[in-house]
Amino acid sequence: VGTFALQLAKRQACIVWGVDTGGKLEAMSAMGFDRVIDYRKQDFTCLGERFDLMVDTKTKRTARELARTLTPDGRYVTVGGDPGRLIALLFARWSGRRNMRIVALKSNKNLDDLAPLLSTGALKPVIDGPHPSSDAPRLIRYFGEGRHTGKVVMTVAESHGQ
């Protein structure tokens, strides 16, 4: 999600910041993020910056922390994360927190718009792999720990003689 969101935002000439761990920052800069922040060293919610759109793939921040990072018309979009935090964000919206907006995304909506971008190479998937399928248990942990960059891809051996 993050790598596609970056590419789509850059097509619209947006300035895009990325927040992740130190091991990924160099790759994120190479992908085109204008600024990268290591959340272990710096709290982006305390920088005083305001954003028009935040796409969050982890949902580890409180509604209060998130609200202070958005412009008055800013939007916060989450695509996964801790269910307890998601519920708290819904309650924050209903309780009148000024900058919180809830945006529901429908699966596979707008795929027809993305297909030409993918087929022409204007939108490129970022692949972490391929990894052998025998590494599946390790890869599940690797993915769960958030150490991957892009989509984790495994090779599956072909059946011969069938």
Descriptions of predicted regions:
Residues 1-162:
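Terminal helix/beta-alpha structural elements that buttress the NAD(P)+-binding lobe
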